[in-house]
Structure formats: structure tokens, C-alpha cells
Curated annotation (Swiss-Prot):
Keywords: Amino-acid biosynthesis, Cytoplasm, Isomerase, Methionine biosynthesis, Nucleus. It is an enzyme of class 5 (isomerase). PANTHER family: METHYLTHIORIBOSE-1-PHOSPHATE ISOMERASE. This is Methylthioribose-1-phosphate isomerase. It holds the Pfam family IF-2B. Disulfide bonds: none annotated. Pathway: Amino-acid biosynthesis; L-methionine biosynthesis via salvage pathway; L-methionine from S-methyl-5-thio-alpha-D-ribose 1-phosphate: step 1/6.
Length: 374
């Protein structure tokens, strides 16, 4: 399902899954085989694959590959559903902050549970799961293109310009973080293809350097005019007047719009507010967690101290003094009051004029109602 490409993070054909080892980019392009949920868990935890949409799809497909090989399974449909549910719960534990993974697992668990109530053959449970996981892969690409289209058009209207828009992005939110095209980087791609992007700036995104290793790699590959900056140069860039907007992705968005994203996003939002630069979040609806009233309830993953103590995001030589303690959160939470709008595949979520807050629940309900009418 998809041809092998330099910027394709997930290469899947039924019964086979290969993941691009993003730790080795941009100097080496290497794919690893994933044959079971255990392989998928390790690939996600070790950041072979990363990006909230991509890890959800990689997890779902890892289990799809595993169950496709269970031809000798002799259990009941209920036992097959229980097997799938247990594996999904295990996969969710690989990276807890990104809601896409837990959301996908919840939907897939519900599917196999319902299927088990009507099917008499356990293999039908596995087949239903495989079909659903494959649909998620296809839908992600189309959703990302819709995010790009909505975002580019909204920025053009909001900034009241028809060309020469320059933006700053953080971390990696492109083809390498999704099944294809990207979220925040998808908006940048849409701006570029529409002939209205002057330049994209990307941060290096320490300590794992997703910006310098991955986003810069994608932008160069697509021949998008781009400049890499140090994380610490972002405020100076905004002060210079060289950019009109910041566009980032999201790992989890609370009901009020508070957004968890790669560490350093909060810094950018504060700087953007100070300098009068618009700040956008681009993410699929699956990144929104309406069960959380605010960002205070979002669990923040902490990564290995080695990512700071050693070069190359922990994979290289020691660069810090032995004995120093380390605090290395993978994400931070940007308050909704610092966010201009949230760009989704269903449209752009804006704030009400009355109280300058997001009403995300109503937006999602309206989007679902509209979809049922099509």
C-alpha cells in the first residue's frame, strides 16, 4: 500500500510493514522490518518512527501484520477480540502523550468487540481489524491534504496577503510524522504549491533535532525555500519582522484548546504573542481529547537523560559533564490564549468574538453532522 519513497515513513503491504529509521536521517535512509506488536512498541518508544499520527498508524499496522500471520489461531471470536484488545493496550503504553495512538486503539477495540458479537469465526475478527487499520493509513493522507488546504486559505485571508508569506515551524510535522503530506508542514506545502510562500523557517528542535534532521530534509527534498535556525534564535527572528506566522503540530489538544506539542512550542507561543505574530496549531480531529478540560490533565512524557548528555539526541558522544542531573520532558503545553486558531481536516477552529475562547466541542459536533449529510 504505497511505493517505497525517500520521504515515506511507513511502507505497508498486507502482511508486511517497514518503518523508516528516522534516527539515522538525513545521512542514511534505512528501513526496519516490523513483524509484530512488540517490534512496533520498540520502534515507537525508541523513536524509529515519531509524530503523533505516524505512531498511531504504525502501531495499528504492526498489530495488523501480527494477526495476519495467526493462521493457526484456534480460539473463539471473543478470545480473538480479547487478544487484539490486549495488544492494543500494550502498544498505547509506548508513548502516552500523543492522543492519536490511544484514540486509534479505542476505535479498533470497539470494532473487534462489535464484530465478535456477530461472527462465528475468529479469523473474521482479525480480518475486520486488518481492514480497519489499513483504512486508517489511507484516511490519514487525505486528512492531511485537507489540513494543508484549509490552513493555506485561512492564512491568506487572515494575513490579508496573496503572496510572500513567511512562516516558522517547530519539530517535524510532515511526511515523516504522518502517513504522508503532513499537518503543519502540510500547510507549508500547500502555501508553496499555491505560489504564496516566500520562505519557511524551521527550528533545529533540540535535543532530538527533528527540525534540523527531518524537517530540513523534507523541505530541501521538496525544493521549498527554507532556512534552519537555532531554537534560541526564534525570538530574534520574530523581532526582525521576517515571519508573519508560526505553525506547529500537536500531540494532544484539550477541550479548551490547550495544546501539548514538542518541547519548546510554549516558548515560541510566548515569543509570538509578544511580537504580534500569529500562532497556529495544525492537527487532525483525532489529536483532540475532549475528555480533558484543559492542558493541566495532559500526561507529559519524560525522555532519557542521554538525549541531553550525549550528542545526536543521545546516540553520539558525551557532551555534558558527568554527574549533572537532567530534566528532559518531551513535550510542553501551550495555553489556548496564545493560539490564534486550530487548523483541522474539517476546517479551522477559531475563537468566539465574545470571550476569545475556543468552542471545540461544538465545532466537532457540527463537523460530524455535516459529514452525515454528505
Amino acid at each position: 500500500m504505497g511505493e517505497l519513497g525517500a520521504l515515506q515513513s511507513i511502507v505497508y503491504h498486507r502482511g508486511s510493514l517497514r518503518l523508516l529509521d528516522q534516527r539515522k536521517l538525513p545521512l542514511e535512509v534505512d528501513y526496519i522490518d516490523v513483524k509484530c506488536s512488540g517490534d512496533g512498541w520498540n520502534a515507537i518508544r525508541d523513536m524509529v518512527v515519531r509524530g503523533a499520527p505516524a505512531i498511531a498508524i504504525a502501531a495499528a499496522l504492526a498489530l495488523a501484520v501480527e494477526v495476519s500471520g495467526l493462521e493457526d489461531f484456534t480460539g473463539t471470536p471473543a478470545e480473538a477480540a480479547a487478544f487484539v484488545s490486549e495488544k492494543l493496550e500494550y502498544l498505547v503504553s509506548s508513548r502516552p502523550t500523543a492522543v492519536n495512538l490511544s484514540d486509534a486503539a479505542t476505535k479498533l477495540r470497539s470494532l473487534v468487540s462489535r464484530t465478535a458479537e456477530t461472527e462465528k469465526d475468529a479469523k473474521a475478527i482479525f480480518q475486520a481489524y486488518i481492514d480497519a487499520a489499513e483504512t486508517m493509513l489511507v484516511d490519514d493522507v487525505s486528512d492531511n491534504k485537507a489540513i494543508g488546504s484549509h490552513g493555506a486559505e485561512f492564512l491568506k485571508q487572515k494575513l490579508e496577503v496573496s503572496k510572500d508569506i513567511s512562516v516558522l515551524t517547530h519539530c517535524n510535522t510532515g511526511s515523516l510524522a504522518t502517513a504522508g503530506y503532513g499537518t503543519a508542514l502540510g500547510v507549508i506545502r500547500a502555501l508553496h504549491s499555491g505560489g504564496i510562500l516566500e520562505k519557511a523557517f524551521c527550528t533545529e528542535t533540540r535535543p532530538f533535532n527533528q527540525g534540523s534532521r527531518l524537517t530540513a530534509f523534507e523541505l530541501v527534498h521538496d525544493k521549498v525555500p527554507a532556512t534552519l535556525i537555532a531554537d534560541s534564535a526564534a525570538a530574534a527572528l520574530m523581532k526582525s519582522g521576517c515571519i508573519q506566522a508560526v505553525i506547529v503540530g500537536a500531540d494532544r489538544i484539550a477541550a479548551n484548546g490547550d495544546t501539548a506539542n514538542k518541547i519548546g512550542t510554549y516558548n515560541l507561543a510566548i515569543s509570538a504573542k509578544h511580537h504580534g505574530v500569529q500562532f497556529y496549531v495544525a492537527a487532525p480531529i483525532t489529536s483532540i481529547d475532549l475528555s480533558l478540560p484543559s492542558g493541566e490533565q495532559i500526561v507529559i512524557e519524560e525522555r532519557s537523560p542521554n538525549e541531553l548528555l550525549n550528542s545526536e539526541g543521545g546516540l553520539g558522544k558525551q557532551v555534558a559533564a558527568s554527574g549533572i542531573s537532567v530534566w528532559n520532558p518531551a513535550f510542553d503545553v501551550t495555553p489556548a490564549n496564545l493560539i490564534t486558531a486550530i487548523i483541522t481536516e474539517k476546517g479551522v477552529i477559531t475563537k468566539s468574538d465574545a470571550d476569545e475562547t475556543f468552542n471545540i466541542k461544538d465545532f466537532i459536533q457540527s463537523a460530524k453532522l455535516y459529514s452525515t449529510m454528505q
